[in-house]
Amino acid sequence: MPLKPANYKNRIQEIKTNPEKAFFYSRDVMKTRWPEAEPYIMKHPAYACLYATDVLKKKWPQAEPYIKDSAYWQSKYENKFGK
């Protein structure tokens, strides 16, 4: 049975506000950036870094303060884009 439109909207809202789900949905389903989910994605160092490298494919200055919260993800980000 297909999702009803109301359920679809609720599900998208749930995905959008979850950094992990939003990253994978953007990368694997939408296959493009998802500006509405970016405020949620950027607050998680791992998914912010992965979103920059896999979806945006460029530096993401707005997310850098959050990425820097994790030495590991900061290192990955800087290896890809420089300091």
Placement of each model-derived feature along the sequence:
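Alpha-helical scaffold segments
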Residues: M1-K83
